[in-house]
Regions:
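Conserved phosphate-binding/catalytic loops in two-lobed NTP-binding clefts
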Residues: 109-110, 270, 287-311
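N-terminal beta-alpha supersecondary unit
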Residues: 3-83, 112, 116
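Short beta-strand scaffold segments in enzyme catalytic cores
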Residues: 15-21, 136-138, 144-148
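Conserved phosphate-binding catalytic cores of ATP/NTP-utilizing and phosphoryl-transfer enzymes
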Residues: 1-3, 110-134, 314
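A contiguous, well-structured pocket-lining segment that forms one wall/lid of small-molecule binding clefts
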Residues: 189-270, 279-288, 294, 319-322
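Short Gly/Thr/Asp-enriched flexible loops that form oxyanion-binding sites at enzyme active sites
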Residues: 79-105, 122-123, 280-289
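Glycine-rich phosphate-binding/hydrolytic loop that grips phosphoryl groups
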Residues: 116-117, 299-337
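Glycine-rich phosphate-binding loop plus the immediately following alpha-helix
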Residues: 111, 150-193, 217-226
Length: 337
């Protein structure tokens, strides 16, 4: 039997990652995080690019060693071509092209957001893959999308955010509360001990299937500002309840439009993807939709945040369709879906 072995390389933001996938299954998925950004309260593009330059060679080598394969066994090299930070993308792109030349292997350009969705199609022992059509809620720091998947490579965005993404709403709310970056996971942590109904924040309801989270950020800002005028220790004394209330508002906003999309499409095979899909309440609420007769797919935590396994599985499907790139293409900070 002829195997298909893909090396995936991810460098769109602040994670340097490399993965080997063979016949749809992960042999390795190595990720190097960049903790340098924490003290700046967000990702600094120049620092991200420099860190990628330092990390990419050892990360790719580690992925190959961990997979237990030889370089000549790689059939193609898939790399993130966008969207993302252009300097960070250039590091992964340049390395992938150099490796392509040295190994004489074809290149595959991966769309970062489409790859997030395809993380659901990574094969594992005992795992059932989503049936098609598949409806996916992709939620990350920069994107919030409802995606209708007719085929793995045939994806259509039917709902998106018109301003801030859900991940931004988490991080901006966390910053207002004085929590360090990245704030989303900390809101999730403190929310575990809080009352989600203690404070009421607005749930946007713009027409159609699109989202808006900018109003929530403003509401949290004004709420905190007004409360600390009378009680300077308000945030410290009510942190768990504020976090739980903010998280409840974001997740209910996400689910309201997603359930509307389910009704409009009639699709019963559903799931989540992207970094925010690691949020405990979102996972719980999504899994509860199985009570409505849906098959619900929630990714492993390692496949939620940016990782190269999703790039490699995207490359796997592209390879099977003979969709290859070339050395002349350049990465793009913005990329049409």
């Amino acid at each position: 039997m002829q195997h298909i072995t893909i090396l995936g390389i991810e460098s769109s933001c602040d994670e340097t990652s490399a993965s080997i996938i063979r016949d749809g299954r992960v042999l390795s998925n190595f990720i190097a995080n960049q903790e340098i950004h924490e003290k700046y309260g967000g990702v600094v593009p120049e620092l991200a690019s420099r860190a990628h330059q330092s990390n990419i060679v050892p990360v790719v080598n580690s992925a190959i060693v961990q997979a237990g394969i030889q370089r000549h066994e790689i059939d193609a090299i898939a790399y993130t071509a966008g969207p993302g930070l252009i300097g960070a993308l250039m590091v992964g792109s340049s390395f992938a092209k150099g490796l392509s030349i040295s190994l004489n292997k074809p290149l595959i350009e991966a769309h970062h957001m489409k790859a997030h969705v395809l993380a659901q199609f990574i094969e594992e022992e005992g795992k059932t893959l989503p049936t098609l059509p598949f409806l996916c809620l992709t939620v990350s720091g920069g994107h919030t999308q409802i995606v209708l998947v007719e085929e793995p490579l045939n994806q259509k965005v039917i709902g998106t955010t018109i301003d801030d993404a859900a991940g931004e709403a988490f991080d901006k709310a966390a910053k207002i509360l004085g929590l360090p970056y990245p704030g989303g996971p900390l809101i999730d942590k403190y929310a575990q001990e809080g009352d989600p109904f203690k404070f009421k924040f607005p749930i946007s309801d713009i027409p159609g299937l699109d989202y808006s989270f900018s109003g929530l950020k403003t509401a949290v800002l004004y709420f905190v500002r007004d409360q600390i005028k009378t009680n300077p220790a308000f945030v410290e004394e009510n942190l768990n309840d504020i976090c739980a209330s903010v998280q409840h508002t974001i997740v209910e906003t996400l689910l309201a439009k997603f359930e509307k999309a389910m009704e409009q499409t009639g699709v019963k095979s559903i799931g989540i993807a992207g970094g925010v899909s690691a949020n405990s309440l979102l996972r719980k609420r999504m899994l509860a939709l199985s009570e409505k007769g849906c098959d619900v797919f929630v990714p492993k935590f390692e496949f939620c945040t940016d990782n190269a396994a999703m790039i490699a599985i995207y490359g796997y499907y592209m390879y099977k369709e003979n969709h290859f790139g070339d050395l002349s293409t350049t990465p793009k900070a913005r990329m049409e879906y």
